[in-house]
Swiss-Prot record:
<dbReference type="GO" id="GO:0005524">
    <property type="term" value="F:ATP binding"/>
</dbReference>
<dbReference type="InterPro" id="IPR022630">
    <property type="entry name" value="S-AdoMet_synt_C"/>
</dbReference>
<dbReference type="GO" id="GO:0004478">
    <property type="term" value="F:methionine adenosyltransferase activity"/>
</dbReference>
<dbReference type="InterPro" id="IPR022636">
    <property type="entry name" value="S-AdoMet_synthetase_sfam"/>
</dbReference>
<dbReference type="GO" id="GO:0005737">
    <property type="term" value="C:cytoplasm"/>
</dbReference>
<keyword id="KW-0460">Magnesium</keyword>
<comment type="similarity">
    <text>Belongs to the AdoMet synthase family.</text>
</comment>
<dbReference type="InterPro" id="IPR022631">
    <property type="entry name" value="ADOMET_SYNTHASE_CS"/>
</dbReference>
<dbReference type="GO" id="GO:0006730">
    <property type="term" value="P:one-carbon metabolic process"/>
</dbReference>
<feature type="binding site">
    <location>
        <position position="45"/>
    </location>
    <ligand>
        <name>K(+)</name>
    </ligand>
</feature>
<comment type="function">
    <text>Catalyzes the formation of S-adenosylmethionine (AdoMet) from methionine and ATP. The overall synthetic reaction is composed of two sequential steps, AdoMet formation and the subsequent tripolyphosphate hydrolysis which occurs prior to release of AdoMet from the enzyme.</text>
</comment>
<dbReference type="InterPro" id="IPR002133">
    <property type="entry name" value="S-AdoMet_synthetase"/>
</dbReference>
<feature type="binding site">
    <location>
        <position position="264"/>
    </location>
    <ligand>
        <name>ATP</name>
    </ligand>
</feature>
<feature type="binding site">
    <location>
        <position position="241"/>
    </location>
    <ligand>
        <name>ATP</name>
    </ligand>
</feature>
<keyword id="KW-0479">Metal-binding</keyword>
<keyword id="KW-0554">One-carbon metabolism</keyword>
<dbReference type="Pfam" id="PF02773">
    <property type="entry name" value="S-AdoMet_synt_C"/>
</dbReference>
Length: 388
């Protein structure tokens, strides 16, 4: 039997974190290609450090001449991302950074398997959902994201001009009878404007927004606060630490509350099952929980490169299932085509909807009118209930 009383911790990082900046650039490149051609192939990696952003990887369009034209857009894409995030500091400014572009055409050997609707690579992918939040996400990661998203809003609006883009949050929540009831500790580190600002000064800025975001009653007199615990945090972003695409895969998913197959998302077009099948797994797990078939659901799928159908489907309802897990496994396979093409079509993934996923979580977000976060819909519940 799983534990019911415990403390669990998850962290998030802001859009200005060096790794997240790289995720944003990689997904912005992807969106640019998909806006031109829904079948574009992109595997874009980004590296950022003091005064420099390097972009590389494989891309493909049906028209080679158009591909060459798109390569010339990369410099502007990078600068637009850095500007939107808010970096205008001396050693990392969107106007003055050096941008190096090493993107090249996708390997024909990879393309030949994918063009036949096979998976773009082998691998395992996990989806998860639970009833801890209205979004059916684990509470520690969901609220860690919410804190940083709120701080970014007030920074960008000019409401809090002393905040800067680079930030991290971490919440330790106490669970009672399997439900989150109290914040045991809050860790918040944020880049700020002036060296003379103390940890207390920064806490005075951020605390009202943290209290606004967290459920009423969760913060108590016993809650520990650690705001900028090392003191000054003026030098930040890629000028403070180098960044790489795909280094925040736990932040991107469930905050450690569920397994992860190891594949990153950002910069990958939806033929890559690292991304699309992980989205499908979340979609299915969320619909299982939304349908009332379980309070918690972990779902795994696996693929082989060039092979269309998943090799396996595994479901664990952690003792909360209303029906046997094997029945749910059969039902999800019956209700959704889990070939790479089937996933792309069911979730309408071949569109420029990815830059927005690059910070504050790929899951637990509201489905959007243009198809963004389509994997967060709960429109499969009736079909699942009929199938079991």
């Amino acid at each position: 039997m799983s534990r019911m009383n415990y403390v669990f911790t998850s962290e998030s990082v802001s859009e200005g974190h060096p790794d997240k900046l790289c995720d944003r650039v990689s997904d912005a490149v992807l969106d640019t290609f998909l806006a031109e051609e829904p079948t574009a192939r992109v595997a874009c990696e980004t590296f950022a450090t003091t005064g420099r952003v390097v972009v590389g990887g494989e891309v493909g369009l049906s028209d080679p001449q158009k591909l060459d034209e798109f390569m010339e857009r990369v410099d502007g894409i990078v600068r637009d991302c850095v500007k939107d995030i808010g970096y205008e500091q001396q050693e990392f400014h969107w106007r003055t950074i050096e941008v190096q572009n090493f993107l090249h055409r996708q390997s024909a050997h990879i393309a030949q398997g994918v063009d036949k609707d096979g998976a773009g690579d082998q691998g395992i992918m996990f989806g998860y959902a639970c009833r801890e939040t209205p979004e059916l996400m684990p509470a520690p990661i969901q609220y860690s994201h919410a804190i940083l998203r709120r701080l970014a809003e007030v920074r960008k609006s000019g409401q809090e001009p002393d905040l800067r883009p680079d930030a991290k949050s971490q919440l330790s929540l106490r669970y009672e009878n399997g439900k989150p009831v109290e914040v045991r500790s809050i860790v918040l580190s944020t880049q700020h404007a002036h060296e003379e600002q103390t940890s207390d000064d920064i806490r005075a800025i951020v605390e009202p927004y943290i209290r606004e975001v967290l459920p009423e009653g969760w913060i108590t007199e016993a809650t520990e606060w650690w705001v900028n615990p090392t003191g000054t945090f003026v030098i930040g972003g890629p000028d403070g630490d180098a960044g790489l695409t795909g280094r925040k895969i736990i932040v991107d998913t469930y905050g450690g509350a569920a397994p992860h197959g190891g594949g990153a998302f950002s910069g990958k077009d939806p033929t890559k099952v690292d991304r699309s099948a992980a989205y499908a797994a979340r979609y299915l797990a969320k619909n299982v929980v939304a349908a009332g078939l379980a309070e918690r659901c972990t779902l795994q799928v696996s693929y082989a490169i060039g092979v269309a159908k998943p090799l396996s489907i595994y479901v664990d309802t952690h003792g909360t299932g209303q029906v046997d897990a094997a029945q749910i496994e059969k039902a999800v396979a019956d209700c959704m085509d889990l070939t790479p093409r089937g996933i792309r079509e069911h979730l309408n993934l071949c569109r420029p909807i990815y830059a927005r996923t690059s910070a504050y979580g790929h899951f637990g977000r509201a489905p959007e009118a243009d198809g963004g976060f389509s994997w967060e819909r709960t429109d499969l519940t009736d079909a699942l209930l009929k199938a079991v």
